[in-house]
A protein has these predicted regions:
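Cap/lid segment of the alpha/beta-hydrolase catalytic domain
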Residues: 298, 408-530, 537, 570-572, ...
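Residue-level detector of Asp-centered blade-edge/turn motifs that repeat once per structural unit
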Residues: 41-42, 94-95, 138-139, 232-233, ...
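Hydrophobic beta-strand positions that form the internal "hydrophobic ladder"
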Residues: 43-46, 96-99, 143-144, 237, ...
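A flexible loop/linker signature enriched in serine peptidases of the S9 family
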Residues: 50-63, 80-87, 100-112, 126-132, ...
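Active-site-proximal cap/loop segments of hydrolase catalytic domains
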Residues: 484-680
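Non-catalytic accessory segments flanking enzyme active sites
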Residues: 38, 144-146, 169-174, 178-197, ...
Length: 680
């Protein structure tokens, strides 16, 4: 099968009517962000949410857009867009005539509805206390809502929103989690409630369906509607949940439960025998099958995600992709229930694959690009896709043909010449084939300084995707040749390659980075091998601290964002203990300190010498900001040129527009200081 490249699709859709220029910080900050697509059952309409940046208010604003798929050449139109109001999470009614959505109009989150042809939106719910999201039953007579309420809450009633205030401002805890990602635990849990849906709305506070299960559904911090699914008849809800308790910070054991939508019976655990993660329950449109993914190993968050299938009549379970060495990242059934569309990383790309539910046969449907959402249709699918040189747009897959539906940022990107991306491979650690890419600034002549970017995870990838936080095209626009390596531990190359980083954080990955940079500077003569800065966040930030003590003479400067500085302190400061303990062999620090100390950057501070910019967020509970302050203290104490950026708003990620803009200015300014490249 021959694929039309994303670059070709982009070239077809976007003209360049004005003088060419490079991508800038302001461009990236102000781009429109399209996502959360929904398609009517008849394939007539596409609706999505689109974020615009309000830089003065330092936030994004979400509106709803629509596109008539039945008309060739139709243009996108705003469906709902009120000033200072966010409209998001669109869903169609079964007949395709109504769009349900979430809105914060009036200051309180509520579910609203609007005719797809337009008109005045109608508010459907009136409960107080906020909620996380919703799903309308296929039968159209119920709405499933998830919201943070006190454990055992019988309904969404405001009295169940928070516990009574303590005598003082202090918080008290008797077990972990005390905080998670960026939030201190307040005693509530994300729980599921069902409300009736009538022509007049969705009255009342609903009924709880979890019957005393204590845990978060969807899971925190990243879970959403993909972790809950209605049965086709609207009588059953399937959901993923990790039962809370003292082992919660040590456990990846989410299970799949089935619950009565009327709350009349206790939920049934459908996966009690698997102690790894089970997630993404997805019922087939014909109501006969339940698909989900399963990980085999307990405590390992990056294990292979195998597509599973349960016959809902007999209870028979089959592993559909047990022999496919890739991880299923998303699941969506075709309307006729004869195909399952999945996404899975594969060598720096994230394509769509089709899985036959009868045989388990896997067929790749798209080529290059990063697929971020898939909505099956009768003839194929509508999907969202981005790349290193293009933010998200929507495309139509019909059979094996891909056609572009939108050019959301055509005007904002007009006149900008994107860089050239070249993928390459080399022999890395263990004599394995390792992949990377190099990004060349458009129109560059002569040699350019290097931005050597190391990804996080560590089970992650520097793939062909757009990013707003670490944007390779923006670094190229600033005049840098960006090099990224998918070292051992990266995803998209089979499970053994990902597993190779366990108990090996500073070993094979560093060998790969050294070999990869050498391969890049040998292959691409436009890279200035003697003028390079290294930068990375999370595991990439750890690697920056490790490089300081192990490879310090190689770089003019280093940018370290939210990286581990002291593995011992990290073992007691982080919240998701399962991750830290798995990565160091499966034991807590006090049982096996040698495993943590072997690759501990703090042990090599005496060898540090490279100028470093340290960045951290005060709301980062994954790698707490004290790790960044400690690294900066070490640099200052040794007299090494260094700078510290502490963001009081940031968690492990920098999300606010002004903070993001500041981040880029600081990073490019620091790199420019040491490479001689003038910053924007």
């Amino acid at each position: 099968m021959k694929y039309l490249s994303l670059a070709s699709l982009l070239a077809i859709a976007v003209a360049t009517p004005v003088a060419a220029r490079q991508l800038t910080i302001e461009d990236v900050t102000m781009l429109s962000r399209a996502g959360a697509p929904a398609v009517s059952g008849d394939g007539h309409w596409l609706v999505w949410q689109q974020r615009e940046t309000d830089i003065a208010a330092d936030k994004g604003r979400l509106d709803l857009w629509r596109l008539d798929l039945s008309k060739k050449g139709a243009k996108p139109e705003k469906l709902v867009a009120e000033a200072d109001v966010n409209e998001s999470a669109p869903q169609f009614s079964a007949d395709g005539r109504t769009v349900y959505f979430q809105s914060d109009k009036g200051g309180d989150d509520a579910i609203w509805a609007i005719a797809i042809t337009g008109g005045a939106p109608k508010k459907l719910t009136g409960f107080q206390g906020g909620f996380g999201g919703f799903k309308v039953a296929p039968t159209g007579d119920k709405i499933l809502v998830w919201a943070d309420r006190l454990p055992g809450a019988p309904s969404l009633a405001p009295a169940m929103v928070k516990k009574a205030a303590d005598a003082g401002a202090g918080r008290t805890y008797d077990q972990l989690f005390v905080r998670h990602w960026d939030t201190w635990s307040d005693g509530t849990r994300s729980q599921l409630f069902v409300l009736p849906l009538t022509a007049d709305g969705a009255p009342g506070d609903g009924v709880a369906i979890e019957h005393g299960l204590v845990g978060d559904t969807p899971s925190k911090p990243d879970g959403g509607g993909e972790e809950v699914s209605w049965g086709a008849d609207g009588k059953t809800v399937y959901f993923a949940l990790r039962e809370a308790g003292r082992i919660e910070p040590l456990s990846t054991n989410l299970d799949i439960f089935a619950a009565s939508a009327d709350g009349s019976t206790a939920p049934t655990n459908l996966t009690p025998d698997n102690h790894g993660m089970d997630n993404l329950p997805t019922v087939s449109p014909d109501g006969r099958s339940l698909a989900w993914f399963a990980m085999a190993r307990a405590g390992y968050e990056a294990d292979r995600q195998v597509l599973m299938l349960r016959d809902l009549a007999t209870g028979q379970v089959r592993a559909l992709t047990a022999n496919w060495d890739r991880s299923v990242g998303s699941i969506a059934w075709s309307p006729d229930s004869k195909r399952i569309f999945v996404t899975a990383e594969d060598t720096q790309e994230v394509p769509i694959w089709s899985v036959d539910p009868a045989s388990g046969k896997v067929v790749r449907l798209t080529g290059e690009g990063n697929i971020t959402a898939v909505v099956p249709t009768a003839k194929g699918a509508v999907f969202a896709m981005n790349s290193l040189v293009a933010p998200d747009d929507f495309y139509l897959l019909t059979g094996k043909k891909v056609s572009r539906l939108t050019s959301v940022n055509a005007e904002k990107l007009a006149g900008i010449d994107m860089p050239t991306v070249t993928h390459f491979s080399f022999t890395g650690a263990n004599n394995d084939k390792v992949w990377g890419y190099a990004v060349k600034p458009y129109g560059a002549t002569g040699k350019v300084p290097i931005a050597f970017m190391v990804h996080g995870g560590p089970q992650g990838t520097s793939n062909n995707s757009w990013s707003y936080r670490w944007n390779p095209a923006l670094f190229a626009g600033a005049g840098y040749g960006l090099v990224a390596i998918d070292f051992h531990g990266s995803t998209g190359y089979g499970q053994a390659f990902s597993d190779a980083i366990r108990n090996n954080w500073g070993g094979w990955p560093l060998d790969d980075l050294k070999a990869g940079l050498k391969a890049a500077t040998t292959k691409f003569d436009w890279l200035d091998a003697d003028n390079a800065c290294a930068l990375g966040a999370s595991y990439g930030g750890y690697m920056m601290n490790w490089i300081e003590g192990q490879w310090a003479d190689r770089f003019k400067c280093i940018v370290q964002h939210d990286g581990v500085f002291d593995a011992r302190a990290m073992a007691y400061e982080t919240e998701e203990l399962w991750f830290d303990e798995w990565e160091h062999g499966g034991h807590p620090y006090y049982e096996d300190p040698a495993a943590f100390e072997k690759w501990n950057p703090v042990n090599y501070v005496a060898s540090w010498k490279t100028p470093m910019l340290v960045i951290t967020g005060e709301r980062d509970f994954r790698i707490p900001y004290t790790q960044g302050i400690a690294a900066f203290t070490a640099l200052q104490r040794r007299g090494i040129p260094s700078r510290l950026l502490v963001n009081p708003n940031a968690s492990h990620w920098v999300l606010r527009p002004k903070d993001s803009r500041q981040w880029y200015h600081e990073v490019l300014g620091w790199m420019g200081r040491w490479t001689g490249k003038a910053a924007e």
